[in-house]
Amino acid sequence: MTTVRTRIAPSPTGDPHVGTAYIALFNYCFAKQHGGEFILRIEDTDQLRSTRESEQQIFDALRWLGIEWNEGPDVGGPHGPYRQSERGDIYAKYAKELVDAGHAFYCFCTAEELEQMRAEQQARGETPRYDGRALLLSAEEVQRRLDAGEPHVIRMKVPSEGICVVPDMLRGDVEIPWDRMDMQVLMKNDGLPTYFLANVVDDHLMGITHVLRGEEWLPSAPKLIKLYEYFGWEQPKLCYMPLLRNPDKSKLSKRKNPTSVTFYERMGFMPEAMLNYLGRMGWSMPDEREKFSLAEMVEHFDLSRISLGGPIFDIEKLSWLNGQWLRELPVEEFATRLQKWAFNSDYMMKIAPHVQGRVETFSQVAPLGGFFFEGALKLDAKLFESKKLSADQVRQVIQLILWKLESLRQWEKERITGCIQAVVEALELKLRDAMPLMFAAITGQASSVSVLDAMEILGPDLTRYRLRQALDLLGGVSKKENKEWEKLLASIA
């Protein structure tokens, strides 16, 4: 009997997302419920954004939650390497096979040619897509251009008509017209694969039997199915999971909700409660109980109990569930966990240099730096009153800084300062006009330790969370303001 093998394949391009943890949990439970294996693979072909620091954060976040893997970059295994950036020769080999078999072709179109092509298609009211012009090149012309070293990509051929039937374990057969599919790029001009080729090749070579992924990938499933057909490989069973939603039913995003697993760890949530809550996202226990462990979820896991309605990720409900777990801890374990969360040496060493020179007794540390150990702050609206800025300008400054910080790939003091500086310059203000607002939002105080150091220590999600808190306190942002300020944001370097 074939061993069930599932996987999670996150990209190390930022903080570990709760959506990644959610999909990882369901893949893990499905594999373990069937006595199978769960694999961790790293999709790091985006060389500009991928970092080893983000990769380590993924490892740490999943392990904090209690999700372990049988094979992966850090534990090894018989199907490695498990980083896509280390599998380039493998992808090149299989891409060449597709070209030789007539299922893919070389495309030498420049970015300017492609942009002009799309513009002309849009002007005609057509859906922009690659028009197949490289297919008209003769074999001799293709070889000449390859020999000359011209930049190129490899694209797959797709049918221009007909229906592709996608067998989904949740929805049954889903019919998707082929005329919605583009001639997908498989290998980029830097020699790295795109998601489609890398996933099909890796899933096959790693013996993946079942793929549980987010439903945002369902519309492009025909491309994956066609690649399996071209290679002559057996296709894994496919399951497209419902996406997590904000309370307003929009797709979960860091603009409306903290999305980093690290944020919830820093906020003092228990990993058991976090897993429990993610397990309730569209799934339920047979007896409908709300509180259950990972082991209990594995024991009773059944895909038929997944609801297709978009599950709502609500911090208030997560907090309620966390309280259930917290209050049931033996008091000794409660004390141990509290000490580990608040007073662990790594975190204290980040904070100590910033408070030591400002206190005369240890009892003064809490009033000065207590905000380091809090989640949501009790903010005072009076702290946001400015002699120079109007109430609308105060909200504008905070909102623009919040948006600007969302674009940061590396969370460092110098880059944080740069974001704030860019906003105040665009608004023709001084740094001293914005910093009191940052102190009020981030520390809940008029003055404290360096707020820029505090933002770096607290991390991106908790910092942004507190800025959103401040905006809510001050009345939020109207749709009209949101539209106007986003235009202004686009002009800020």
Curated annotation (Swiss-Prot):
Keywords in alphabetical order: Aminoacyl-tRNA synthetase, ATP-binding, Cytoplasm, Ligase, Nucleotide-binding, Protein biosynthesis
One GO-annotated biological process of the protein: glutamyl-tRNA aminoacylation
SUPFAM superfamilies with a match to the protein in the record: An anticodon-binding domain of class I aminoacyl-tRNA synthetases (SSF48163), Nucleotidylyl transferase (SSF52374)
Disulphides: none
PROSITE patterns the record matches: AA_TRNA_LIGASE_I
Main enzyme class: ligase
Predominant location category: cytoplasm
GO cellular component: cytosol
Single GO MF descriptor: glutamate-tRNA ligase activity
HAMAP family recorded: Glu_tRNA_synth_type1 (MF_00022)
PANTHER family listed in its UniProt record: GLUTAMATE--TRNA LIGASE, GLUTAMATE--TRNA LIGASE, MITOCHONDRIAL-RELATED
Name this protein carries in UniProt: Glutamate--tRNA ligase
Species this protein is from: Pseudomonas putida (strain GB-1)
Biological classification of the source: Bacteria, Pseudomonadati, Pseudomonadota, Gammaproteobacteria, Pseudomonadales
Name of the gene: gltX
